[in-house]
């Protein structure tokens, strides 16, 4: 996959992508990440990329022409078609199903806004989709772009050392439930013991426990996800057992 990022601070994206899963994906040739700065395509001695908004008001607005020229250069760098995605608090919420859709693309261009935003005419003419990473406002789109890069990169074949890691994540699978708890060594600690079932070697019992914990944790923390999940009789039985086994002080 190739991802081009248009940003006034492309080095920020490069630094975020230099480590962990995304860095490893680049080393393996599974991800090509390229930053583009609109200031490099601005005119005049000051290479201005923003100006005051019509109608007055605070802040500055990113100008059409530097962005248009920058986008043209980014698109020309690779012949494959690429949707242009603007990171915006007004966009479609980024979810795991949407991430899976985007991960199937061979290429995408991410646009990071700054100041009060981007001239609406550029958004109308050049942007295919707006995506939000949450109902809050950041100083710019770079953090959102870094999140999106990470989310879609880890879904690429060969990026994770164990493909099952992604399949068992929260929000994955047809039900989109939260993940179950995980434990490692030591088995006994002052802060608690590892559940006995995980040390039993009984794979059927372990699978049942993990499924029940996934259902129960979703019910406790994100109950609205269960409204959209299709649970069979076994799932409903496991969830009911989980509810009954809760200590009185832990009940919702």
UniProtKB/Swiss-Prot annotation:
The gene is trmD. CDD domains: TrmD-like (cd18080). Coiled coil: none annotated. It is found in: Cytoplasm. Disulfide bonds: none annotated. Specifically methylates guanosine-37 in various tRNAs. GO terms for biological process: tRNA N1-guanine methylation. The lineage of its organism: Bacteria, Pseudomonadati, Pseudomonadota, Gammaproteobacteria, Lysobacterales. Keywords: Cytoplasm, Methyltransferase, S-adenosyl-L-methionine, Transferase, tRNA processing. InterPro entries: Alpha/beta_knot_MTases, tRNA_m1G_MeTrfase_C_sf, tRNA_m1G_MeTrfase_TrmD, tRNA_m1G_MTases_N, tRNA_MeTrfase_TRMD/TRM10. S-adenosyl-L-methionine binds at residues 113, 133-138. It catalyses: guanosine(37) in tRNA + S-adenosyl-L-methionine = N(1)-methylguanosine(37) in tRNA + S-adenosyl-L-homocysteine + H(+). GO terms for cellular component: cytosol. The keyword S-adenosyl-L-methionine applies. PANTHER family: TRNA (GUANINE-N(1)-)-METHYLTRANSFERASE. Belongs to the RNA methyltransferase TrmD family. This is tRNA (guanine-N(1)-)-methyltransferase. GO terms for molecular function: tRNA (guanine(37)-N1)-methyltransferase activity. Its EC number is 2.1.1.228. Homodimer. Pfam families: tRNA_m1G_MT.
């Amino acid at each position: 996959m190739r991802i081009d990022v248009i940003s006034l601070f492309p080095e920020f994206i490069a630094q975020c992508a230099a480590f962990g899963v995304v860095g490893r994906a680049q080393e393996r040739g599974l991800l090509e990440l390229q930053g583009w700065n609109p200031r490099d395509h601005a005119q005049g001695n000051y290479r201005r990329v923003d100006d005051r908004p019509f109608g007055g008001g605070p802040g500055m607005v990113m100008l059409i022409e530097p962005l248009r020229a920058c986008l043209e250069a980014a698109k020309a760098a690779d012949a494959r078609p690429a949707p242009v995605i603007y990171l915006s608090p007004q966009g479609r919420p980024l979810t795991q199903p949407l991430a899976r859709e985007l991960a199937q693309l061979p290429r995408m261009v991410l646009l990071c806004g700054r100041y009060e935003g981007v001239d609406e005419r550029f958004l109308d003419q050049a942007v295919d989709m707006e995506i939000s990473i949450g109902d809050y406002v950041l100083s710019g789109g770079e953090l959102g772009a870094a999140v999106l890069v990470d989310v879609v990169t880890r879904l690429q074949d060969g990026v994770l050392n164990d493909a099952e890691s992604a399949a068992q994540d929260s929000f994955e699978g047809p039900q989109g439930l939260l993940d179950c708890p995980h434990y490692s060594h030591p088995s006994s600690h002052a802060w608690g013991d590892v559940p006995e079932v995980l040390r039993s070697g009984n794979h059927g019992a372990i699978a049942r426990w993990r499924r029940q914990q996934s259902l129960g944790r979703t019910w406790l923390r994100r109950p609205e996800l269960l409204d959209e999940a299709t649970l069979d009789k076994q799932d409903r039985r496991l969830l009911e057992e989980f509810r009954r086994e809760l200590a009185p002080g832990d009940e919702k």
